[in-house]
Amino acid sequence: MTYNQPNNNGFYGNFGGQFIPETLMTAVIELDEAYREAKADPSFHEELDALLKDYVGRETPLYFAKRLTDYIGGAKIYLKREDLNHTGAHKINNALGQVLLAKRMGKNKIIAETGAGQHGVATATAAALFDMECTIYMGEEDVKRQALNVFRMELLGAKVHSVTDGSRVLKDAVNAALRAWVTNIEDTHYVMGSALGPAPFPEIVRDFQSVIGREAKRQFATVSNGQLPDAVLACIGGGSNAIGLFYPFVNDESVAMYGAEASGLGLDTDKHAATFAKGRPGVLHGALMDVLQDEHGQIMEAFSISAGLDYPGVGPEHCYFNEIGRATYDSITDEEALESFKLLSRLEGIIPALESSHAIALTQKVAKELGADKSIIVCLSGRGDKDVAQVKERLKQEAKEGK
């Protein structure tokens, strides 16, 4: 059966949709119509492809991680090097696509939310390129954790708005950005950073990020005499790098799909972001998806060492994949992610983002299970420059405590 989601109402099975106030409906309908037109227009794709090639530096390599493979002693591990993109992560794929769409719609102002700051930097970069005014909403906690990325955004000409509501992290930044969009829909486009939000956002983000999986599929075929990998794997917060890798393989039933979510200090604590392990369906930021909530339906605070993964929900298409068993989602602790951060740095000379380190940690388990005659493609979603200072402090603290 050929996969054909979302349906015309923006649902992936029971997940997704448009759970938004009437005031936002006009903007969302306008966006949907503009996106359908752009999607059918070859000149839009030509302009985006040229930017991805000449400005972003695509295609990114598919790198056989021999030393990591030998160390684990299981499946051959290929890293899809999204860390080598301009701005250092996969986020630029989507930001450029959406800012190009905004230009086509005649919008001259851009707003976005950001957690780790990577989507904020990517959006500020695209806005600078197209000479658009840019405001980035970022939780106060994340502003502290990611001071370097805040400076980068400001250097690129963006205004960074520190959000002091709620738990002052990513979900609060999304709330603030949506509120700002409602009052400025005539001249402003909201660049959603992950495969979340009301339809058509999850589909738009998926389509712009699918360049990851399309390239990886083609590259793997080149090194394997036209074969498919046995598995593809990525970390998952909202889920955009994962959906970008997964989607081009969704009809290839022989290819297993694995997502690594963040279990923070452990599933037996309340300090985690393991939505599939501990969440249940609810509405958040305009879509029905699995979310972390208490017994009264209040959204709970997510926690992870990685600012890009501490979101209390997960994109509706991943929820659908989980429900129908097309993908398998497992959780990785802060400790496991830190070990993998160090491991990849030492074995391959590649310092991964803490988000991507969760994927590397799950890869160690999956590669062993698959065995030596199999192959796995792992999305290395971003580089670790932004995390080095945080990890240094963490390791210093652990040394002091004698861990």
Swiss-Prot record:
The keyword DNA-binding does not apply. Pfam families: PALP. It catalyses: (1S,2R)-1-C-(indol-3-yl)glycerol 3-phosphate + L-serine = D-glyceraldehyde 3-phosphate + L-tryptophan + H2O. The keyword Signal does not apply. GO terms for molecular function: tryptophan synthase activity. Tetramer of two alpha and two beta chains. The beta subunit is responsible for the synthesis of L-tryptophan from indole and L-serine. Belongs to the TrpB family. This is Tryptophan synthase beta chain.
